[in-house]
């Protein structure tokens, strides 16, 4: 997720400078490779790279091909066969044993729904999005279709107008019934040679970090490295600030009764209770039991969590333990 955010930032910088760009996307991997389908790299006409498509082995060659795509303004499919023992042709030994198919698309700034804009839209709302990219291995030398459609909730962006009508119906049906929890590639042999990469783009994980003590500092740093969205919550104003937690996108300060009214949660939100304040966490946990969170981590010994649950049950509040992880 962090890589997609960096990709958009790199795009904005290049756009501000009026630079032409191309987007390289790993669309299919057969065998072993450093990156899986969905890995991306943005290339500018000046050769600036944002993101990565391998462990550093393919970037040089992909850069040269991307600049060709920028010049020709036509999508290109490139295949790297790292099962070939003569992998020195890519510059260094790859250390892989797979075949990587890379789609390189020009970014047309005059087009409202080009691939980067579709990705931007996917990240604009905290809702799972489905991105559709179409390519053909059988006609790899021909111009490719590319990333053309995004579905997020009831909203649609882009279209299937670039592909034959018989494909449109089949892919639309697939989109409407897509319920899988992971990416997949679908071929339609009865229709022809096209392959479709269905890619799920979830919103970044939001971490509600309760506690601004010194032990919360490395947790915040890890959240930033992983590209998570951090909300810091604490009653101690001297500790809960941007100087100590510069990566926090939101800081909520105040008594427990006040902060619980300001919590923003969804199915992609997790909570970490690290305040070292039993009464504070008791009130917080009381509120969190009413939210559909997949993970609530509680710092401290198991007996502390048992005591918290016991206090809540005495108040007639039922606590579902499936989402509780204690010790954290």
Positions of predicted regions on the chain:
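Segments forming oxygen-rich coordination pockets for charged ligands
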Residues: 1-235, 239-252, 266-270, 312
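A general structural signal for well-ordered alpha-helical segments in protein cores
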Residues: 63, 116, 281, 305-308, ...
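ADP-ribose/adenylate-binding Rossmann-like module
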Residues: 233, 270, 275-281, 286-311
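Short, well-ordered secondary-structure micro-motifs
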Residues: 242-245, 262-264, 282-285, 309-310
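Extended, composition-driven regions rather than compact fold-specific motifs
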Residues: 243, 317-318
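Short, structured coil segments at secondary-structure junctions
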Residues: 246-248, 291-292, 320
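Short amphipathic alpha-helix with an adjacent loop that forms part of the alpha/beta core around
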Residues: 256-267
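Active-site capping/gating segments
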Residues: 301, 318-328
């Amino acid at each position: 997720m962090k890589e997609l955010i960096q990709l958009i930032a790199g795009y904005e910088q290049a756009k501000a400078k009026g630079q032409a760009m191309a987007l390289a996307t790993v669309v299919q991997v057969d065998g072993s490779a450093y990156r899986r389908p969905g890995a991306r790299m943005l290339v500018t006409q000046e050769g600036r790279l944002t993101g990565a498509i391998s462990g550093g082995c393919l970037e040089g060659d992909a850069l040269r091909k991307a600049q060709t795509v920028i010049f020709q303004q036509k999508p290109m499919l490139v295949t790297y066969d790292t099962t070939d023992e003569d992998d020195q042709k890519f510059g260094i030994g790859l250390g892989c044993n797979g075949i990587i198919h890379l789609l390189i698309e020009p970014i047309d700034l005059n087009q409202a729904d080009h691939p980067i804009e579709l990705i931007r839209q996917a990240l604009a709302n905290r809702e799972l999005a489905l991105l559709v990219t179409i390519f053909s291995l059988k006609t790899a030398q021909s111009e490719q279709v590319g990333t053309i459609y995004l579905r997020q909730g009831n909203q649609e962006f882009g279209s299937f107008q670039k592909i034959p009508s018989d494909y449109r119906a089949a892919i639309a049906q697939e989109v409407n019934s897509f319920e899988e929890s992971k990416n997949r590639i679908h071929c339609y042999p009865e229709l022809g040679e096209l392959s479709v990469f269905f890619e799920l783009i979830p919103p970044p994980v939001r971490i509600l970090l309760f506690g601004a003590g010194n032990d919360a500092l490395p947790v915040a740093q890890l959240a930033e490295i992983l590209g998570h969205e951090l909300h810091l919550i604490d009653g101690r104003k001297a500790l809960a600030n941007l100087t100590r937690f510069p990566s926090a996108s939101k800081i909520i300060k105040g008594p427990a009764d006040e902060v619980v009214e300001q919590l923003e949660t969804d199915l992609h939100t997790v909570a970490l209770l690290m305040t070292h304040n039993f009464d504070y966490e008791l009130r917080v946990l009381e509120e969190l039991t009413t939210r559909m969170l997949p993970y609530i981590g509680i710092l401290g010994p198991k007996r502390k969590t048992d005591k918290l649950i016991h206090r809540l049950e005495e108040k007639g509040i039922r606590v579902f333990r499936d989402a509780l992880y204690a010790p954290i």
